[in-house]
Amino acid sequence: MKINNLILLFFIGLVPLQSINAAEYRLGLSMHDVERRIEGGAAISLEKIFDRPNWWHPYAGRPHIGTHLSTANNTHLLYAGSTWNLFQKGKFSGELAFGAAIHSGQEDIKKDQLGFGCRVNFREMIAFGYQIRKDQLLQVSAQHMSNGSLCDPNQGLTSVGIRFAWKIN
């Protein structure tokens, strides 16, 4: 799946969510594939986290949709899921996210190439943040995408980086 298709899917995915108020946007820069270093370079991420709609289960966190784009044109992700606040202590906070990701990488493991087993995988993220202003947050985050051994063997993809978040409403 080419990067243009992933970007198009990201914006198409936002259309049905327009009725949900946006809580915040996040822009990030991360080291891509820190675990195996088969795919090097940086990745840029863009994420939109929504306020929890009335019909959303109260324990399901806040819905999010985002993309993770490799600057070296390796594996790109389009993902969606839920984000939970773990703690808020003064200006410090923590959060956890879980959902699904569609990737542009290979499914089979090959020499010098990551393989992810199936096209759609699980995606988890943990982040710790510092509130710069009332509507701005700086986070250190780590995300991992893997199929959880539900399909063919996979190597997973782990990225670590920083994100800037700003609240809209």
Predicted ranges, named:
Residues 24-33, 58-71, 142-146:
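Transmembrane beta-strand segments that form the barrel wall of outer-membrane beta-barrel proteins
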Residues 29-32, 38, 55, 94-125, ...:
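Outer-membrane beta-barrel translocator/channel fold
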